[in-house]
């Protein structure tokens, strides 16, 4: 798939976030050595698994590296997030990553696992001796280790004004604006988005135009409000994104659909917006 580890850019113009534009081959470090040594000599039916994890510290801004950690899968939960938590708690407290709900709801633990974007809490650890490589979301500025800067992503989401807009307020202030079951069903496949950024950071068009192309996530939410029967700014919303870069950088590669942990298809929603632009 096109959103693997090749050609990743994890640098930034800011000196605080400065990183190299390539990954360094994994090498052993002394951090957590005691716990790793204990695991590697676990004997008695231990099922050892090596995790290669991207490390970069802004307080020591050299080249990033992949660091090896070995854990016993028999003493670990089944998900990649379980392994990360075990490593942080028992081997290396300096390892930094985002996580919260552990249920695929918050989207915090989005990262690149063995070349594919996904949520660590929903990705099962593959059995076998092959190493599992964990890196930050592709083509995002790295803050530290697996934590990326989501500022631009959230600003793009904010730019599509993701809230109900009315020209005619409800007759009774505070009264709910109703819609039919049929109109409500039109929002399926869009409202479930958790803004994890797996789709946008898997998109080659977004890699090369992150400042101008809104990306799959923001455009999916744009269509969510364009399709909402209660919203009265459909024309204005369409005009706001009728732009060569904001909308039409999408070339229907559909990496976004393959990467989405919720099974959504942003490419389909973007196509719907393009069709409305033509018919409008």
UniProtKB/Swiss-Prot annotation:
GO cellular component entries: mitochondrial inner membrane; mitochondrion; plastid; respiratory chain complex II (succinate dehydrogenase)
UniProt keyword Transmembrane helix present: no
Recorded superkingdom: Eukaryota
Binding site for a ubiquinone: 208
Predominant localisation class: mitochondrion
GO molecular function: 2 iron, 2 sulfur cluster binding; 3 iron, 4 sulfur cluster binding; 4 iron, 4 sulfur cluster binding; electron transfer activity; succinate dehydrogenase (quinone) activity; succinate dehydrogenase activity; zinc ion binding
Entry's Gene Ontology BP terms: mitochondrial electron transport, succinate to ubiquinone; tricarboxylic acid cycle
Keywords, comma-separated and alphabetical: 2Fe-2S, 3Fe-4S, 4Fe-4S, Electron transport, Iron, Iron-sulfur, Membrane, Metal-binding, Mitochondrion, Mitochondrion inner membrane, Oxidoreductase, Transit peptide, Transport, Tricarboxylic acid cycle
Pfam family of the protein (one): Fer4_17
The record's free-text note on cofactor binding: Binds 1 [2Fe-2S] cluster.
Family affiliation: Belongs to the succinate dehydrogenase/fumarate reductase iron-sulfur protein family.
PANTHER family in the cross-refs: SUCCINATE DEHYDROGENASE [UBIQUINONE] IRON-SULFUR SUBUNIT, MITOCHONDRIAL, SUCCINATE DEHYDROGENASE IRON-SULFUR PROTEIN
Protein name, per record: Succinate dehydrogenase [ubiquinone] iron-sulfur subunit 2, mitochondrial
Source organism of the structure: Arabidopsis thaliana (Mouse-ear cress)
Organism phylogeny: Eukaryota, Viridiplantae, Streptophyta, Embryophyta, Tracheophyta
